[in-house]
Amino acid sequence: MKKSFVFAFWMVLSGLVSAQTIEVSGEYQGRVLWDADTVRLVGDVFIEPDEGGEACLIVERGTWVIAEGYYRITIHNGSFYALGADKIPITFTASDTTDFYNPEVISGWRGIRLVSDQSNNQDTVFMEYCRVSYGKVITGAPEGERFGAGLEVRNKKYCYFAHCVFTQNRCGHNGNSPNSGGGGGMYVVNPGTLLVEHCVFHDNYAWWGASISAGGLRHFTVRNCEFYNNSGHYGTALDMHVGELSLSDSGPQVYNNYIHGNHGNAAYLGWEGVGLLHDNIIVNNEGYSPVLGTTAPNYSHYYNNTIANNRSEAFIGGGGSGIWTNGQQKIYNNIFYGNTGIYFERMDPSHADPTAYNNCHLFPNGVIGNYDIYADPLFVNPTGGLGPEYDHATDAAHWSLLEGSPCLNVGATNMGTFCPETDFLGQPRVVNGRIDLGAIEAPDWDGVEEQVAKSCAYPNPGKDVLHIETTLENAIVMVYDLNGKKMWEQQVNGSPTNIATEDWPSGMYFWQVVSAGTTTLAETGKWMKE
């Protein structure tokens, strides 16, 4: 436990509460601190400014906030700080999840609501190493109560989310328009700046924005995140309604994300103006509509994305992407592979005038670009089929390129300031003045002697230990997380590795086997930490 003895005290003026286990409900003013092993939410909590104009909730690392009913935490005209640590996260959840998946039954809890009256305030939101689960919006909820099952944020100056997990949050279906509700994991509207990085969203549901639904954005970045097994209709990973952006606005940036195995349109991009999507891996999703969709006069840049084995069965569009409304998108250096749609394997250009250069497709249809390649890109190990049913860790899929791939060193470099600096794994994007296609830059194969090896990682998935075995003599084994951080490096000679992983965060990792003393990449694969 966090403390070796039990004590409790209450300071009325500051709202300070500290104990092993505390119960909270009702109205508070000013600064409130929750520093306890467990905070039991036994009623709605409402925090508003004190006479000095301050309102703030601070949750200390290691705290479990458990709702004992369908209750909600609301901060009105104030800030929110929940800063956990790598091995000491903060958890927000519900004690009773009976009938949670019945959209008409009140169950779970009502999540966190952070609302300011005006967008020009100084209120901020910081969440780091937090886990938010079992937030719920029921079908038939009153208007104004239909957004943000896990988290709802309105009119905050700065919002920062890092190393957080949003899972098992559900928004009931209250209509088909964006105004009818959405945001299973989080709903954010009119932030001054929104940054989401190194977060995981899985098993959330909403008709609009199962993971993230956001609107009124000017400075918005989602990077190095993972989205999987979310369900809905529009934007199972991202649903963004931005409005008109001027050239002075930075525009949305979505890069280095892994979006896979979702049930529904992966990303719905409703912004007007310039946005940048690059170095994302978007694979094995399925939905009524295309994997990517834009419905506003849109001038976004799509660079070096790998969009593969997605399935769009019922909408007139592409399994790869659909551009539905007038726009002049820039589409460079992407790989479209194995996607299915009613008409297009790649992008439906019916209502747009995009500029496309140096993309790779299995066959010509949809958007036709300059210097396109129509060939198998030769991935190291693509998934074995279309849709979420083939999105399994045991498939050891890896979307880097083999030696001999037609996608090596043929990418366009005329993107100006929009040219990405790094690839999906954080490696330099431009090598010797040349760029590969797709999300992962391959090693420089020039002058490398071909080597053949057989390697495997087990158990997969695993928990506390990872073994990597290879037939390559004098080999070096390296393991990276999704952000390109090297977690392990070891030289092996015939014996399998014995890597202790109990302290590693759950998620996806990539392993590589190289020949010692060279840069020869012999084999690579994927490993899932439970």
Model-derived regions: residue spans:
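Bacterial Sec-dependent N-terminal signal peptides
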Residues: 1-21, 460, 527
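Beta-strand/loop edge motif enriched in small/polar residues
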Residues: 20-271, 284-288, 311-313, 319, ...
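Acidic glycine-/aspartate-rich tracts in secreted/extracellular proteins
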Residues: 63, 85-87, 96-99, 136, ...
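Predominantly extracellular beta-rich ligand-binding scaffolds that present long acidic/polar faces
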Residues: 240-398
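C-terminal accessory segments
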Residues: 371-441
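Low-complexity, Pro/Thr/Ser/Gly/Ala-rich linker/spacer regions in secreted
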Residues: 441-453
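C-terminal outer-membrane/trafficking sorting elements
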Residues: 450-458, 462-530
